[in-house]
Amino acid sequence: MLSAFTEAVRRSGGRAVCLVAILLTVGRQDRLSAQGFLSQFSYDNLKPSALQLDLGPVGGNNIRGTLTGGLRLDYGFIAPHVRVLLGVSYYKADFSSAARARFEQRLKSVVIDPSADDTIRLGPITWSDVTGDVDLQYVLPQGRAVITYLGIGLGAHIRHGSGPAINGTFVQDALNSITAGLNGTIGAEVGANRWRFTLEARGVLSSGVSTGSLRSGVMYRWAGSRDKRPGTPK
């Protein structure tokens, strides 16, 4: 009986040791995979390599369509096929009629009007937006002269509202804001030399107004970076 008990303990202990060994092996493989992934990221290749100017139409959920322009700096590759872009852009758009009507209704709901016969007319309102953003773009070469990319990034939006009826009032103060946004991009570059043509669709999710734009522009890639393949080390 004692020998049977000893044999059972031995088998149970053996199974436990095997299980621990398997878990340690899997855990070690996961750590090695994570270390291998992180080792692909490096700051060594980060340096200004190209400058881009773009212009195109933009529309949003609370504004009328207008034009937007931007300036972008390609800051090199932080990982294979992953580059960093720093950008600034600007637009100035009119409030849409529906957005202005909703805003007037919200103001009316907080105004004390005993006779209930007052009306609020804000008139034309414009909203300007200055954005600074950082994008990570995954670059997919399609040949020597064409590059496509997908990107995601974060932006800071400085907005300013203005209009003849609201300037200097609390309404203008309510429209002035600084907020964050999430960017998504898809685009292409065409050209094998220093000068390249760019085409990009960009969507922005942010508080107050979310926008979509289609921009075209030119990029100048200076010497030392034009022949460098995406993601290759120095």
What does each model-found stretch correspond to?
Residues 33-80, 223, 234:
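Short glycine/proline- and aromatic-enriched beta-strand/turn motifs that initiate or cap beta-hairpins
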Residues 43-51, 80-84, 144-150, 178, ...:
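Outer-envelope beta-barrel architecture signal
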Residues 53-57, 69-75, 88, 132-138, ...:
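Residues on the lipid-exposed face of transmembrane beta-strands in outer-membrane beta-barrel proteins
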Residues 56-59, 118-123, 168-174, 201-206:
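Extracellular loop and loop/strand-boundary signature of outer-membrane beta-barrel proteins
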Residues 72-164:
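Gram-negative (and chloroplast) outer-membrane scaffold detector with strong preference
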Residues 211-234:
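Outer-membrane beta-barrel "beta-signal"
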